[in-house]
Regions:
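The alpha-helix within a helix-turn-helix
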Residues: 13, 28, 98-99
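A short, conserved structural fragment
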Residues: 116-127
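Short amphipathic alpha-helical interaction segments
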Residues: 101-118
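Amphipathic alpha-helical "lid/sensor" segments that cap RecA-like P-loop NTPase cores
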Residues: 16-69
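A cross-kingdom feature that marks ATP-driven nucleic-acid transaction machinery
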Residues: 136-309
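Alpha-helical sensor/transducer elements of the RecA-like P-loop NTPase core
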Residues: 1-19
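Winged-helix-like regulatory helical subdomains adjacent to P-loop NTPase cores
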Residues: 47-99
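Short, Lys/Arg-rich nucleic-acid/phosphate-binding segment
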Residues: 125-137
Length: 309
């Protein structure tokens, strides 16, 4: 059984106490908080040096780790490998995964259930509709696997030539923030649950997750059209029938009014069941000056540093 139990992002940070908060978060993202992988990080070396040393060299411990773990666990390794690759690239429903890899749905479902049992994949449900089977997505639970599948297969030949460092600098480092997007969302959900249990947001938060669905918006011509919509963080208080919703951006650009407007608009899609007590924004790079014009108690502007305070 693989089942690699993971630390939360705060406990994972204790392995690299001298790192900046951004590098602590990235360290959590590439190891998934798994103690075994965290212990491989040399805190005297930079996060970039550690990533190159562990993933982008043929003798790197994590270069072969995913292959080894899957080979030990699964006989139908080709199918499993294809499934994990599809999930890592963003395909997350049974029929799209089956279609992409050319396998029948029952075959894919069998492998997915095994991947869930060993703790590599999890079923994500829309938090306000947990009983709706159609609203189920499959996501990689293990971030180290997610990182590996996102970057290593494409780089194998370059790494085998001994040029993994160049590949990392040119093809991975520039998109590391994009990879960290879903990791940061999970960190923010943990943070809100941790604070919300104590009643910090004016209600007693008992569950946290994500929401997705459809919204109707007007296009440039004023015509109303349906588009898919999601909310990164939705924390619910079923006792108070209240919700806290949030948007997370792990980017080198500030959050602007457009992102604020989108969250306020999408919040209305869940207000039939819950009254929203707080809108919380999480930004790696802060906020534009427009936010200084905001007043009111119901909007909280947080940064990555807030998560580590």
């Amino acid at each position: 059984q693989i089942k690699l139990e993971a630390f939360n992002y705060l406990d994972a940070a204790k392995f690299v106490p001298e790192y900046s908060n951004e590098d602590k978060a990235i360290c959590y993202g590439i190891t998934g908080g798994v103690a075994k992988y965290l212990s491989l990080i040399d805190p005297r070396k930079s996060i970039d040096e550690n990533i190159i040393r562990l993933f982008f060299r043929t003798d790197g411990y994590l270069y072969d780790e995913t292959r080894n773990l899957l080979t030990q666990e699964f006989s139908d390794i080709a199918v499993v490998n294809n499934i994990v690759e599809q999930i890592a690239s963003g395909e997350n429903t049974l029929n799209t995964i089956a279609g992409k890899i050319g396998e029948k749905e029952p075959t894919v479902l069998y492998s997915l259930e095994k991947l869930i049992n060993v703790g590599l994949v999890e079923k994500k449900k829309c938090i306000t509709e947990e009983k709706n089977k159609k609203k189920t997505q499959y996501v990689l639970k293990d971030y180290m696997f997610k990182f590996w599948y996102e970057f290593i297969p494409k780089a194998t030949s370059v790494i085998e030539m001994g040029q993994g460092e160049i590949y990392y600098e040119k093809a991975v480092k520039p998109v590391l923030h994009s990879f960290m997007g879903s990791v940061f969302e999970e960190m923010c959900r943990y943070y809100i649950l941790m604070k919300g249990i104590t009643g910090e947001y004016g209600c007693f938060i008992t569950s946290v997750g994500t929401w997705w669905g459809v919204e109707n918006v007007a296009d440039k011509n004023g015509d109303i059209r349906a588009q898919s919509a999601d909310i990164d963080v939705v924390a619910l208080s079923d006792i108070d029938k209240m919700a806290v919703i949030g948007e997370c951006k792990f980017k080198n650009e500030k959050i602007d009014k457009g992102i604020y407007d989108t969250l306020i608009r999408r919040g209305k899609l869940i207000t039939a069941k819950y009254k929203i007590s707080k809108y919380i924004f999480f930004s790696l790079s802060g906020y534009t000056d427009w936010f200084e014009t905001l007043s009111g108690e119901d909007v909280l502007l947080l940064t990555l540093d807030s998560l580590y305070e």
